[in-house]
Amino acid sequence: MKAFTYERVNTPAEAALSAQRVPGAKFIAGGTNLLDLMKLEIETPTHLIDVNGLGLDKIEVTDAGGLRIGALVRNTDLAAHERVRRDYAVLSRALLAGASGQLRNQATTAGNLLQRTRCPYFYDTNQPCNKRLPGSGCAALEGFSRQHAVVGVSEACIATHPSDMAVAMRLLDAVVETITPEGKTRSITLADFYHPPGKTPHIETALLPGELIVAVTLPPPLGGKHIYRKVRDRASYAFALVSVAAIIQPDGSGRVALGGVAHKPWRIEAADAQLSQGAQAVYDTLFASAHPTAENTFKLLLAKRTLASVLAEARAQA
């Protein structure tokens, strides 16, 4: 780990301004991903801005009847919140499917959204990786790619986004609230938050330099059956090969989003319109642009079967 300076700030505006003022600065809250990356010198911030004291740890009901989740709400607290468990069960279940209890106690809402890929080539500084070192190449393209993306890929990167929480939040039409160094606030839908890899996979989100996430807002809850199904190599502390988040109504309508298959939570609204036609029709829409490698083609069949299993469960409990 390389040397860095450290400061604590008192307001979100102060945090954003400090991040803009100091080149190479990073925000730190739970640190569950950032500290690992710093130890490996994948992330080498010159300055850490501790945002834990900003009071962004509340869950509040909005005037519209939704929820406003502070950026610093810990994953454990969010999953256990009475309103989340009752009205946004898919989110609670996704959170509990991720990481371990110890990590959930420390990890924050904003940090979960911003966590980096777990591609082994990203973590190996001896390997080329366009996400870590732009222009160096992508070792995964011709390497071990069993866990990598099958949709939304480019010739520069085939890494997946690892978050379970983000998949559920995308299903729920979450909106990310931020503050810029100029003191302006922005609202970014989660649908627009993650950038496709294209030729610049190192630019992962829509955040501007120094911009700080302050909250995530959820619209009023949707009724129906909430399901989160995660398929992985072992029963705990493993990232998804494929995951499916779904909210299905008694009449068979609803919405679905997938994890483990792309650089972001994978949702195509046109697929929702196919739910009444069954899993095959939904799958065909979601994976029309699939571009798997020889090693991860199995994910396509796995995704189709997981979709079918989720829809069958929803029908059985309707």
Curated annotation (Swiss-Prot):
GO terms for molecular function: 4 iron, 4 sulfur cluster binding; carboxylate reductase activity; FAD binding; flavin adenine dinucleotide binding; metal ion binding; oxidoreductase activity, acting on the aldehyde or oxo group of donors. GO terms for cellular component: outer membrane-bounded periplasmic space; oxidoreductase complex; periplasmic space. Pfam families: FAD_binding_5. SUPFAM superfamilies: CO dehydrogenase flavoprotein C-terminal domain-like, FAD-binding/transporter-associated domain-like. One of its GO terms (biological process) is catabolic process. The keyword Iron applies. The complex requires PaoD for activity. It is an enzyme of class 1 (oxidoreductase). Heterotrimer composed of PaoA, PaoB and PaoC. Oxidizes aldehydes to the corresponding carboxylic acids with a preference for aromatic aldehydes. It might play a role in the detoxification of aldehydes to avoid cell damage. This is Aldehyde oxidoreductase FAD-binding subunit PaoB. The gene is paoB.
